[in-house]
Structures are given as C-alpha cells and as structure tokens.
Amino acid sequence: MITRRTLALLAVTFLAPAAAEAGAAKPKLEARIGELKAKTAALVAAQRPHLDALSPPQRLAAPPAIWRVPGGLTDFKDCSRCPQMVVIPAGEFTMGSPPSDKQAETQHRVTIAAPFAVSKFEITFDQWDDCVKNRGCGGYRPEDEGWGRGKRPVVNLSWENARDYVSWLSVKTGKPYRLLSEAEWEYAARAGTTTPFWFGATIVPSQANFDGSTDGSGPSELNRQKTMPVGSFPANAFGLHDMHGNAWEWVEDCWHDDYTAKAPTDGSAWVEDGCRGHVGRGGSWEDSQSELRSSARSGGFKDELSSTDGLRIARGL
C-alpha cells in the first residue's frame, strides 16, 4: 500500500472527480424493525393452529440466524468454507480525526442507515486458495513471502484481485458480497469508540500486529516483521479481529486527498468512473501505530501488489 508520503504523487494521476449524485435515502432501522415485527406477528398468527398441532419433536426449526438481525449481533456463514460474517448494526458516527491530529481526515458525520455484515477476520490464504481451486480469482496464487499460508491473511493482493474474490463469492453463494466502503470500514473498526484505536488513545504490540519499534510504542523484539494468523489478537466490541494492523484492507472507494463536501454522508463508497487509485484501511505489520488509527487512510493503484495488502469483505443483508 502506498503510504501518505507518496499520496500526493497518486493524486495528480487521478482523473478529476465527477460530481456524485446523492443516493436515495435509506429507511430508518426503527421502521425496518417495526415492519419485520408486524410481518412476523401476522405469519405466526396465520400458522398458529398448525404449529399447535405439531408434537414437540416435529416443531419447525428456529429460523436462520440472519433472520434475527434486528434482535442483536449475529455471526453466520453462507457455506462451510465461506468467511465467517458478523452483522454490524445501523447507527451514526463521526468519521475522520480531530484537527489536533493534523491529518487529511476531516471530521464529518455519517449515518449507516441499515445493518450490514463484515467478515470477522481478514480473508485468509485458505479462503483465497479455495477460490483459485474452484477456478475463480483469475487463477492468481499470491506469494506468501515464506511466512506460510493457511490462516494467515492473504497478501500481495491488488484492489482488482480483491474485487475478483468478492465477485466469485457472490456467484458461489448467490449472496451480495462486496468490498466495504471507507465509511463502513471506519464505523466497523471504531465499534462505538471515538478514540484513535478501539483500545483507547494508544496501542501496543500485544494488541495488534505492527512495527512498534518505529515510534517507541514497543520493544524492537516485538516487531514481528510478518503477518500473524487471523484472530491472534482481541476482537473489538462488534466482534471483529485485526481491524488494526496485520494487513492493509482494500475498500471500494477511489482515493481522494481529503474529505470534502462531496464525500458521502450515508456510508456509501465515494467512487467515480476512471479512478486509478483506491483506499486501504487498517495499517499492516510493517507500519507504525499512527498508520493503524481507525481514521488513518492510505492509497494505492488498482493493480498494485504489496506484501502488506490484503482484504476484508462485506455483505448486504
């Protein structure tokens, strides 16, 4: 992933952004819950005589967990080898960093109007290799840098590779998998917090995989200099692991130097035709803690490969 020091070079290569039309307003979560409750009550009333007639062993199984989205957070998988997904609730948050941080991350309010699902872990080599085995992902087998494959996050992925994976998974499952938007990613990473990290104001190498030796946040021996198996570090309040560090995670958005009045406030991706660069979030094993902040952003060309770049995925509900 290209770091902030080279983003100015990226910016001058991009086509001038087209004015984005505001998306259609999404229904409020409260209205959606009310509608689901009403429909459920009607269905139960209609089927009550039949249900009462069944003996206990014959009673219908509980509905799939994903049907219970309004009731709370839920994990699910669409197939045995599919990524484990976590339902993220709707809500509002302040995206970006305060002026005191002196970063190109201007704060603004964003509304996530409907729940969506995010992979609990970064996509692993096992999951990527399953895509290749099933004639997907362009047959591309990325290098693992000698660190091993298995449950380590897949790296050496371009943004285009990341799009290939979600396209394949969507066809395989018939479900709407995609990359997260920048806003969705930060909302999921923060998990209700307003501090630089979901842990608080600082982060140490026992909490995430990054280069703690570069800024004094940890002893040099804890600079692991490679990825770690996913789930090696604690999950945030939404149940997501490795939102800070391990591998940069490609999102859908085109790269923009900073948020402006054109930046979406509804959680959608900020895209335009012809953009060559895209955004990465989360930082990686080789970055200092400043690059791991929930608001930190980086960018890269859509066909760029790096041992720091991987992905996390989203799914519509």
Predicted regions, residues:
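A short glycine-rich, aromatic-capped structural motif
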Residues: 77-138, 158-160, 245, 317
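Short, structured beta-strand segments at or near domain termini in extracellular proteins/domains
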Residues: 306-317
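Short capping motifs at secondary-structure boundaries
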Residues: 49, 54, 129-141, 169-175
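Functional-site microenvironments in short loops/helix caps that host divalent-cation chemistry
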Residues: 94, 98-99, 145-151, 157-298, ...
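Boundary at the C-terminal end of the N-terminal hydrophobic targeting segment
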Residues: 20-24
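Short, P/G- and charge-enriched loop/turn segments at secondary-structure junctions
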Residues: 72-76, 103-107, 216, 297-302
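N-terminal pre-domain segments of enzymes
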Residues: 26-76
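N-terminal export leaders
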Residues: 7-8
